[in-house]
């Protein structure tokens, strides 16, 4: 396609931003290797559908569904989100003065009334064992810092000759949750506390930790402390950081200390938020690589809001066309794919969105997904395919009327003779040599693979 003048300026601006970060827009291919989070993690998180009050039975039901229907397609993580230690957690928000279950060392443990298998000090190990028995991996959410309750009780820190009140920073608090104080990492015993909680969770069999209230604003010392604690356990645990948006200037630090980091605030089923995420995700184009992935947040698809912190029980308010646009962007951007809906409630269409192996291959096998072109409400993304010379192509119309988007293969660095395959429809597309005009409906998208003809 002939890229309009304004779009070329936008593209050059992106190149200038990337150069300032020493991150090439079109970096050389990185060979995928067997490493932790070698491809974007794929899984389920309880937040979008069950908010603060998810139960063991609900987690097990989603794990069973994933094992039966999604594991063959690469989905593997089951993650319990916030407030799992609070017996009286409720829908619709956080309790202002929560009572949290914790052990004698000020470490949070599951609320037995919600997670019965955790009784008698077993923690999440029985639930993690169940998840592992299904061929899946188990994760949990933590808040930055130490429970305020532990500070009030001045509990000892396991493995150190200090107590909670000596390491807490009472001026370092979360703006939206009253559970924790931050840790003053310069004080003796602060690292020991993080070591103790990660050691406990590793003993339960945790494979994934979502650390919250740690990225915006960024708390580098506590991120590094959690990363260090994970390394000490010797267990491969994926570390996810929230909430976003992360700062682009922190990219190297994030790569060194985490496996995924949020690039947006909480993402819900609103077109306005999806439109914004095209910009936020686009900033990080080409940055993801094995071991470290910019994260567009959970996928609010299927049935959500059942007993959530926000909203009511509903099927995703995204239209079917918009739901496909979400999956197309997350796939070509190589964002982690963390499904937010209640899996057993999935309808046929929702299941089709997350079991199309040709689409999922863009996310799992592609590399350096980046915005190639932006003009008005048109967006074009490209990513490098795993096959020599192949590219993935995403076309998006964020506007309110149908648009034609014309692309010429040589502008993508491809020869005129290419096979164009529609990945959603799983069929090759016939058309003139060297070019194609994509007719894209309002809020819609297309996802394709271009392979040089032999």
Over which residues does each language-model region extend?
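Structural recognition of the beta-strand scaffold that forms the well-ordered cores
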Residues: 41-46, 76-81, 137-142, 202, ...
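C-terminal beta-strand-rich structural cap/linker in extracellular carbohydrate-active enzymes
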Residues: 431-454
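Glycan-recognition surfaces
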Residues: 166-172, 184-186, 192, 196, ...
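Carbohydrate-binding surface patches
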Residues: 324, 330-333, 338-340, 374-414
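Aromatic-lined carbohydrate-binding/catalytic grooves of carbohydrate-active enzymes
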Residues: 67-202, 206-213, 220
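Bacterial N-terminal signal peptides
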Residues: 10-22
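Aromatic-lined carbohydrate-recognition surfaces of secreted/lumenal glycan-active proteins
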Residues: 136-151, 216, 231-248
């Amino acid at each position: 396609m002939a890229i309009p003048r304004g779009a070329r300026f936008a593209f050059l601006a992106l190149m200038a931003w990337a150069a300032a970060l020493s991150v090439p827009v079109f970096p050389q291919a990185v060979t995928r290797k067997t490493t932790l989070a070698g491809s974007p993690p794929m899984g389920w998180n309880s937040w979008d559908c069950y908010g603060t009050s998810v139960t063991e039975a609900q987690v097990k039901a989603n794990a069973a569904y994933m094992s039966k229907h999604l594991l063959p397609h690469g989905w593997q993580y089951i993650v319990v989100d916030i407030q799992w230690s609070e017996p009286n957690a409720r829908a619709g928000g956080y309790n202002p003065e929560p009572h949290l279950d914790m052990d004698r060392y000020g470490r949070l443990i599951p609320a037995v009334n919600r997670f019965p298998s955790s009784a008698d000090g077993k923690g999440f190990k029985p639930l993690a064992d169940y998840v592992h028995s299904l061929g899946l991996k188990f994760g949990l959410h933590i808040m930055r810092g130490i429970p305020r309750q532990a500070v009030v009780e001045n509990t000892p820190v396991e493995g150190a000759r200090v107590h909670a009140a000596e390491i807490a920073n009472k001026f370092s608090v979360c703006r939206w949750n009253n559970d924790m104080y931050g840790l003053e990492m310069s004080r003796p015993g602060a690292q020991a506390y993080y070591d103790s909680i990660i050691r406990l969770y590793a003993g339960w069999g945790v494979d994934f930790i979502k650390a919250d209230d740690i990225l915006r604003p960024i708390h580098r010392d506590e991120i590094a402390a959690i990363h260090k604690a994970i390394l000490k356990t010797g267990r491969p645990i994926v570390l996810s950081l929230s909430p976003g948006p992360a700062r682009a200037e922190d990219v190297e630090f994030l790569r060194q200390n985490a496996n995924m980091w949020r690039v947006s605030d909480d993402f819900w089923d609103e077109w306005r938020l999806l439109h914004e995420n095209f910009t936020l995700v686009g900033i990080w184009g080409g940055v993801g690589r094995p071991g470290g992935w910019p994260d567009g947040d959970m996928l609010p698809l299927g049935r959500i809001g059942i007993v959530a912190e926000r909203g009511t029980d509903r099927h995703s308010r995204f239209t079917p066309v918009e739901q496909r646009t979400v999956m197309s962007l997350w796939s070509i951007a190589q964002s982690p794919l963390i499904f937010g809906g209640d899996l057993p409630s999935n309808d046929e269409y929702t299941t089709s969105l997350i079991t199309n192996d040709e689409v999922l291959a863009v996310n799992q096998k592609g590399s350096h997904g980046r915005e190639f072109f932006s003009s008005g409400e048109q967006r074009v993304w490209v990513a490098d395919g795993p096959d020599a010379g192949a590219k993935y192509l995403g076309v998006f119309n964020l506007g309110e009327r149908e648009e034609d988007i014309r692309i010429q293969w040589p502008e993508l660095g491809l020869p005129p003779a290419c096979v164009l395959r529609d990945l959603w429809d799983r069929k090759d597309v016939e058309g003139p040599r060297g070019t194609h005009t994509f007719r894209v409906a309002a809020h819609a998208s297309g996802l394709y693979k271009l392979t040089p003809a032999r």
